[in-house]
Amino acid sequence: MDRPQWPGGLIAQVHGFVFSWWGVILLLAIINLKSFPGIWTIRALYHMKSSFNGQLRQTVASPTAENAQRRVPKTPKTGATDTIDHHPLFQPEIISSHVSPAEIDFNMHKSNSTYFTDLDISRIKLVGRIMAPAWPLDRMHVEYKGRDGEMKRERVKGRPALALGATCTSFKREMKVLARYDVESRILGWDSRWLYIGSWFVSRKGGKGKEQLFASSLSKYIVKKGRITVRPEQFLTESGWIPPRPESTGNSKSLDSLQANGHGATENGKHDAKDTWTWEEIESHRLKGMTTVGGWADADLRLEQAYSS
């Protein structure tokens, strides 16, 4: 079979375009696309929507007396030897990117300031998955201390938010132009106010076990419903990510009263105890993560106090 013959004029035109200034401009536009105005917003919305909707498809009905329409994520163990590291709440979200020429500083490395735009995208992807089951919190009975000093548990009006409160980033190695990398973010732990997320910039070109760490970052998020702060533990419990705290630990009765928590949920919404992670397992993992967070959280508070003093 004869090969198709391309018109000589067309080949000349393509060749002329590729090696013209227009070709150079097109190439620069492609490799700098992530730095164009509006592209960050498109990336953020894409990852938020895909992560949020993807998690919603992995939920099952688990109604309570307070919330008849409650849905929770399916979080069963895959086997008797499955470890808490595999719990979906603690699984990382990963985005892949590259260093565009527009991100280079005068040292010809990725500018420090540009790390934060990538961090935003990675954390948004993670947060979109975590918030999906309970959002927008309209049916949640939030526990909080009222202005009269009394503890309340009721539905709260207002706009929900899972907002970034602070972040700290440590730079390990430089990244040169066009270098490819992944940004991995996962939940480390939480306290009475903040949800802590760890993020890492890594190169995986060496294969598994040979990753190269470029930077690490620690961030904290707060859950809000209107002006009211929602405790991370309550948010995660009513979202079905973690089971209610056992009575023996001395937590509030209201959380103990929740009957269904989503752990070990099957397609029909039923639960099997042998397929679940216990509250003690999750709490142990949270405390392990908080040992990483503790020093930074204290330093952040001292830094704020140093300015005020």
UniProtKB/Swiss-Prot annotation:
Known glycosylation sites: N112
Uppermost EC category: transferase
Family of the protein in this entry: Belongs to the lcsJ thioesterase family.
SUPFAM superfamilies recorded: Thioesterase/thiol ester dehydrase-isomerase
Entry-linked PANTHER family: PROTEIN THEM6, PTHR12475
Organism per entry: Purpureocillium lilacinum (Paecilomyces lilacinus)
GTP-binding keyword on record: no
Localization in the cell: Membrane
Keywords for the protein's UniProt record, in alphabetical order: Glycoprotein, Membrane, Transferase, Transmembrane, Transmembrane helix
Summary of the function given for this chain in its UniProt record: Thioesterase; part of the gene cluster that mediates the biosynthesis of the lipopeptide antibiotics leucinostatins that show extensive biological activities, including antimalarial, antiviral, antibacterial, antifungal, and antitumor activities, as well as phytotoxic.
Annotated TM spans: 11-31
EC number: 2.3.1.-
Primary localization: membrane
UniProt topology in membrane: Single-pass membrane protein
GO cellular-component term (any): membrane
Compositional bias ranges of the Polar residues kind: 248-260
Induction comment: Expression is positively regulated by the leucinostatins biosynthesis cluster-specific transcription regulator lcsF.
Keyword Metal-binding applies: no
InterPro entries (UniProt xref): HotDog_dom_sf, THEM6_lcsJ_thioesterase
Organism placement in taxonomy: Eukaryota, Fungi, Dikarya, Ascomycota, Pezizomycotina
Recorded superkingdom: Eukaryota
Metabolic or biological pathway, per its Swiss-Prot or TrEMBL entry: Secondary metabolite biosynthesis
Any matching Pfam family: 4HBT_2
Protein name: Thioesterase lcsJ
GO molecular function: transferase activity
Region (Disordered): 61-83, 239-275
